[in-house]
Structures are given as structure tokens and as C-alpha cells.
């Protein structure tokens, strides 16, 4: 008799995706981040759902409702901080997942990669609108500054900004619609994740060597389920340590001051995971130029498959490309640090240099290094 998991219409899908899935035998721990992102998404949806039960999306009561969750709701404080720090863990996993894709040439699976970039945009949008909800100072001014960037669009800019605001400033209408967006977007992310997996399972996983692994595949369960559980336990451990020992480590103290349109915080800055893009935005002296650079800093990922000039897929055997990759990682971290610094010398100059290097590495230096490595193969 055939096992029910192989015959039942629903269980068959789960079986082919998570149990009997043929997987390369040599994928490393860098391949853990996909499942960790799935775990993060589930945790965020669950904690978010419980927060939404007690939150009120109204300018007069939003801040108080968040404080009420922390003080009066049973275990509300831990739900709130798991949600806030869960977002940080989400982005750590996202950046590691993208870095893995860049290093090992996973972007050659173009459909999977492009859906991944769309997912990144959606997660960033969700995190941005979510940060506005507690209605603290940084929530309000962050929303004002970032939405205002759209006014740089010629001709329709101002109309567009006022349309998003639902008025002439960030106010009640803005908060209400941002809450609606923040509630619906995670489910869109969930749907996109399924499409992402669908495209991935059409081709099968890549592996560290970047060569076909058709001759050496093993079932996903138990080999990789146990490996994923280990990764999940480590992620949960880090998240719990962050939440229970230093819940406000990654947050901004300004957000404990209720939103006040009449007083601007000394330094307006987004959460740490947007700082690299914020640094690129600030590096361009022109408003429209800055907005375009900001967009391009993420959209550039879509061009990476087109910029692949190497005869090898993975960077495993390409020392020049490896050096440039780690230079890009260092540059990303530098931009993240600079994004959190005030707009003054020397940070401005460093930010401009780091921004130029960011685009130069991806668009020019890495494709050139690949061509040089191709030549070296013939020696």
C-alpha cells in the first residue's frame, strides 16, 4: 500500500516540498536562512495578530494602546518585543540569504531571484509602515520624511504624497491606512513566498560548488529537517536573548516620546536595517537623485543575473570575486554605520565614498574580476 503522504492531494504537495524533496548532499549552513525566514514570517504574523487585538490605529490612542499592551495585557510586553526584535532577526536572515545568493550564484535561477527581490521590497514596505504604528516621535517623523521623498517625482510628486497621507500632513488617515497595509502585506508576503518556493522547486537547489548535483541528491527529510531545526533553535535563542535581556537595544529612545508634529527630533533615522539605504539617500545632494539612488540600491539586485560574466557559477573557486564580495559586505556594514551618524564631516564624505563603492563594485568591478578569472582559467 502506498503511503498516504504520497497519495493525498494536499499531503502530496507538502511531501514533495518538505519530505521527499531531492536536495543536494553538500549544501552548507548558508542554505538554512530560507527556512529561518519562513519561521520569522510565521512568528511575525502570530505575534502581530495578538498585538492587533489590543492596538487602536488612531492618533489619539495609538501610543497609549502600545503602552497598555506592555503594561496591562498578559504577557503583552513579550509579544510586543518579540515582534519588534523579530523584525530585526527577519532582516538579518534576509541579508544573509541574499549574501548567500550573491556568493554562490543562486541568482542564475532568475525567476526565483526576481520573486526574491520583490519579496525584499514587500518586507521593507511592511517594516516601514509597521514602524509608524506605535506613533512615537521617530514613527511620526520617519513617516513624514520618507513619504515626503515621493514629492521629488516631477509633476505628480506633491499630489502623490498628499494622496498617500490622506491629507496635507501625516495624520489620523495616514495612521489608519498604514495599519491596514501592515496587516495585509504579511499575507501577500506569504503568497509570494509560496511562488518563490514553487520556482525554486522547478530547478532544485543550487549548491556551494555551483555545479549540477543531479547525480548526488538526498531526501530533505530527515537530513535537512534536523539541520533546519538546529538553525531554528539558534535563531529562537538569539531572539529570546535579545528580547529578554536587551529589548530596546536596536530601537530608538525617541520612540518612547509620543508623536509631536511641533517638535522635530535632533536626528531622524530609520531602524538599523534601513540605514544602508538611508546613507545612500543622504549621500546625493539632490533630492530626486537621492531618491533614485535609494531605489537603485535595492533594484540593482535585479541586474545581477545580467551582470554575471564568469564561466563558473559559484565564487568558491574565484579568489578575486571573493575579495570583492567581502569588500561589498564591509561596504554594506560601513553604510549601515554611517546611516546612523549625523550629517556632518567626516561622515558625509565617507558615506559618499561608500555609496560610490557600492555601485562600482556591483556594476563594474565584480563583472570585470569575473572576466579576468575567465582569462586565468586558460593559463
UniProtKB/Swiss-Prot annotation:
Its GO CC terms are: mitochondrial inner membrane; respiratory chain complex III
**PROSITE patterns in the cross-refs:** CYTB_CTER, CYTB_NTER
The UniProt record lists the keyword Transport: yes
Give the residues the record marks as binding heme b b562: 83, 182
What function is annotated for this protein?
A: Component of the ubiquinol-cytochrome c reductase complex (complex III or cytochrome b-c1 complex) that is part of the mitochondrial respiratory chain. The b-c1 complex mediates electron transfer from ubiquinol to cytochrome c. Contributes to the generation of a proton gradient across the mitochondrial membrane that is then used for ATP synthesis.
Alphabetically ordered keywords of this record: Electron transport, Heme, Iron, Membrane, Metal-binding, Mitochondrion, Mitochondrion inner membrane, Respiratory chain, Transmembrane, Transmembrane helix, Transport, Ubiquinone
Which family would the database say this protein is a member of? Belongs to the cytochrome b family.
Q: Which organism is it from?
A: Mesoplodon peruvianus
The positions annotated for binding a ubiquinone are 201
User: What is the protein name given in its UniProt record?
Assistant: Cytochrome b
Q: Where in the cell is it found?
A: Mitochondrion inner membrane
> Assembly and partners?
The cytochrome bc1 complex contains 11 subunits: 3 respiratory subunits (MT-CYB, CYC1 and UQCRFS1), 2 core proteins (UQCRC1 and UQCRC2) and 6 low-molecular weight proteins (UQCRH/QCR6, UQCRB/QCR7, UQCRQ/QCR8, UQCR10/QCR9, UQCR11/QCR10 and a cleavage product of UQCRFS1). This cytochrome bc1 complex then forms a dimer.
Gene name linked to the record: MT-CYB
Report the record's Gene Ontology biological process terms. mitochondrial electron transport, ubiquinol to cytochrome c
